[in-house]
Amino acid sequence: MKKNKISKSWVIRQRRDKYVRQSKLEGYRSRAVYKLKELDEKFKIIKNNLSILDIGSAPGSWTQYLSEKSKGSKIMSIDLKDVEKIEDVYHVVGDFLDNKKQKIIKDYFPKKIDLVVSDMAVNTTGNKNLDSIQTGELSLTCLLYTSPSPRD
C-alpha cells in the first residue's frame, strides 16, 4: 500500500513539475538537462571540437545537450544501462571503473579528454545516512578517476 501512495505522489509531482514538462516539449529525455544547461550558461564549459566523456549518462539528456551544443566534438557516454542512440555519440554499457571499459575509453580518447561530466546517482535505499555515504563514495570515485596522475 505504501509503495502505491509513493507512486501516485510521484506521478502527481511529475505532472506539476515545470522542468519535466519543459524537457518533454524540448525533446529531452529528462529534466536533469537543465542542471547542465545552467552550469554551461554560468561557466561556458561546453565548446565546439572537444573530447567529452559523460559518466553515468542514462537516460541521456546530458548527452543530448552535449551533442547539440558541442559541434564537431568527440563524445562518449557510459552507463550501466543502455540508452537510446544519440547521433554522433559512442555509448558504452558498463561500469566505468571496469578495466575493460577503461581500455575502451582510453582507446576512444588516445590523447586527452577535455571535459568530463557526470550526473551519476546511487540507487537509494531510504536510509539517509547510507545513501549519503554511497553518494559521496560515487562522487569521490569519479573525481579520482578523472583527476590527472602525477605523470600526466
Regions found by a protein language model. Give the residues of each.
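Glycine-rich S-adenosyl-L-methionine
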Residues: 130-144
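Conserved SAM-binding loop of SAM-dependent methyltransferases across substrates and taxa
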Residues: 59-70
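Short SAM/SAH-binding signature in class I
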Residues: 113-122
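Conserved small/polar residues in nucleotide/adenosyl-binding loops
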Residues: 145-152
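Conserved SAM-binding motif I beta-strand of class I
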Residues: 74-78
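Class I SAM-dependent methyltransferase Rossmann-like catalytic core
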Residues: 2-47
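Conserved class I S-adenosyl-L-methionine
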Residues: 49-58
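S-adenosyl-L-methionine
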Residues: 81-112
